[in-house]
Amino acid sequence: MKNSKLRVAVLGAGRWAEFAHIPGWQRDPRCEVVVICDPLKERADDFAQQFSIPESTSEWQVVIDRSDIDVIDICTPSSTHFELAWKSLEAGKHILCEKPVARNFRDTLRAAELAEAKGVKTKLGFTFRYSPGVQFAREMLDDGFVGTPYIYNAYEQNSQFLDPLNPIRQVKLDSDPAAIQTSSLEGYGAPVIDIGHWWVGGYQLE
């Protein structure tokens, strides 16, 4: 692939795909988004037209099985991440996956072990580390400016992607509980915890 672009398939035609993932891939001249997949075919079609993506489909397994796809980008509802990631890893694909990979540590570790066995690259959607302010704080820690940290306290608040003209409720009352995030900790808490690990050190597995 030295002389060709990475061919990317995006699974999920939602807000993160629209405002972050697809624009990010398309800004990188080394990459090409070649297919967008969503259970709602008409939504995938709309995204394909909006972003000039050659193909759209509702068949995620067909996409994962394609030999001409290098990277699978998973930005679907949290409850679907593990199955999609696992199948992608089994197919030998590189993965960018929104957090969390799975709903429990055991499945997350299994996925990491499979990725290592397959020799593929994986990345979680923890973008806060790349914020200039967060990186500056890390530099201050590395330089010893604040001494040795022992406790990390944090809170997170933002209103990104919220339409001020619409109600704040993001989940329909009749939504399947198994298909939504279990808590705010899973959604916005996860990257804040990741920053803490990066700043002051994470847990060491023995």
Explain the meaning of each model-derived region.
Residues 1-51:
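N-terminal Rossmann-like dinucleotide-binding module
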Residues 28, 51, 66-67, 131, ...:
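Acidic-histidine catalytic/liganding microenvironments
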Residues 36, 72, 152:
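Receiver (REC) domain switch-region micro-motif
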Residues 51-114:
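Beta-loop-alpha module in the N-terminal Rossmann-like domain of NAD(P)-dependent dehydrogenases
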Residues 110-128, 147-152:
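Rossmann-fold dehydrogenase core element
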Residues 128-206:
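Predominantly a Rossmann-like dinucleotide-binding segment in NAD(P)-dependent oxidoreductases
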